[in-house]
Amino acid sequence: MRSLLVLLALAACASAQYFFRGGDDDNGFFGGDDDNGYFGYFPRFSYPIYRPIYRPIYYPQIIRPFYGYGYGGFNGGYGGLGLYGGYGGFGGYGYRPFSYGYNPFSYGYYGFGDDDGGFDD
């Protein structure tokens, strides 16, 4: 019974990180990658168990790859190392609809809108 409770606690922690950690690294390729705190590239806004069935109408990935916009979320962190040696940049600030920066590529400088260093690729 205790091991079952431990497993449930670990699952709860993992799912909380899944929703609230600042999102996916783009390896410095797109400067406007999002942090998946509020609006994600794919809808993490929905719970994982519903994801095969439920999809929100709003799909920012249609727009973002061309313009490098990053959708700000709850807690964007510093970006990881970019593919070409630049840092990814910041995730997002609070509930801002867009992270800072129109920056399709991040070569050696901060491309605002990137995220948590690829921990959650």
Swiss-Prot record:
Expression across tissues: Expressed only at the mantle edge where it is found predominantly in the inner side of the outer mantle fold.
Protein name (record): Prismalin-14
Organism per entry: Pinctada fucata (Akoya pearl oyster)
UniProt keyword terms in alphabetical order: Calcium, Pyrrolidone carboxylic acid, Repeat, Signal
Modification type Pyrrolidone carboxylic acid: residues: 17
Region entry 4 X 4 AA approximate tandem repeats of P-I-Y-R, spans: 48-63
Function: Displays inhibitory activity against calcium carbonate precipitation, binds calcium and affects crystallization of calcium carbonate in vitro. May be involved in calcification of the prismatic layer of the shell.
Region forming the signal peptide: 1-16
Source organism, top-level taxon: Eukaryota
Sequence repeat copies, ranges: 48-51, 52-55, 56-59, 60-63
GO biological process, one term: shell calcification
One Gene Ontology term of the molecular function aspect: calcium ion binding
